[in-house]
C-alpha cells in the first residue's frame, strides 16, 4: 500500500524513466526500420521478432510497423500480454512480417512460467508475389 503522496512520486518516476528510455530507443528503432527497408526494397521477404520492451503504442512499434505488419494485430485475440511482472501487463514482445506472409493464429502461451515474458507465436503462410 502506498502512503499519501507516494503514488504521485512513483508515477512521476515511472513517466520520467519511460521518457528517458524512449529517447534512447527512438534512434535504435529508426536504424532497424532502415535496415528492414533495404531488404524490402530488394523484394526480400522479412520476418522480424523479439523482445522490443515497448508496447504497441510506442514510437518504436509505430516506426517498425510503417514497413512491416504486426502479426498479433493481424491474427491474434485479446490484449496479447507477453510481459507480466511487477503489476505491469503489456505486449512488449512482437512478431512483424512483410506483406509476403499471411499471419494467422497468433497467441501468447501463458502456461510458460520460467520467465517474466510469455512466448508469443503465430503461423505464417508464405504468399510469393508474382
Over which residues does each language-model region extend?
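Metal-dependent phosphoester-hydrolase catalytic domains
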Residues: 26-47, 52-130
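A solvent-exposed, charged loop/short amphipathic helix patch at secondary-structure junctions
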Residues: 2-22
